[in-house]
């Protein structure tokens, strides 16, 4: 069952070490902090074995620079907590893809990332290419 706060929701993928978040519309820094804490709590048991994160951004509005900075902080926290790969489902939005790539780059974590149109494509990539 998904946990929800404002524009954000978080759930785990049954049988896999994957946390999926989805957003709709405009988010804010408080929701992003909640998102970070909720994802970390959901993945806490997998720190030693590794896990993956999927962000379904396909229905999100672009973020502000301040929100982008919060996403950079989130990325660092996820990697420090054992996240091995980030997968982004961005629909057909070039803007969301560019923002996600820049935020990951700014995190300076070197985490593996993939960009996809759908969550199903992201799940397949994590299974076939990342083995999660």
Residue ranges of each PLM-predicted region?
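Amphipathic, Lys/Arg-enriched alpha-helical "gate/interface" segment within cytosolic domains
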Residues: 1-132
């Amino acid at each position: 069952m998904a946990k929800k706060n404002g524009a954000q929701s978080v759930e785990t993928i049954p049988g896999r070490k994957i946390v999926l978040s989805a957003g709709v519309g405009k988010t804010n820094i408080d929701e992003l902090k909640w998102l970070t804490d909720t994802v970390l709590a959901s993945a806490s048991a997998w720190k030693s074995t590794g896990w993956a994160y999927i962000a379904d951004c396909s229905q999100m509005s672009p973020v502000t620079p301040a929100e982008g900075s919060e996403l950079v902080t989130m990325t660092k926290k996820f990697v420090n907590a054992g996240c091995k790969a980030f997968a982004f489902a961005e629909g057909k939005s070039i803007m969301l893809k560019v923002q996600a790539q820049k935020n990951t780059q700014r995190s300076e974590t070197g985490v593996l990332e993939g960009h996809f149109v759908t969550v199903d494509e992201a799940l397949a990539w994590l299974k076939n290419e990342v083995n999660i």
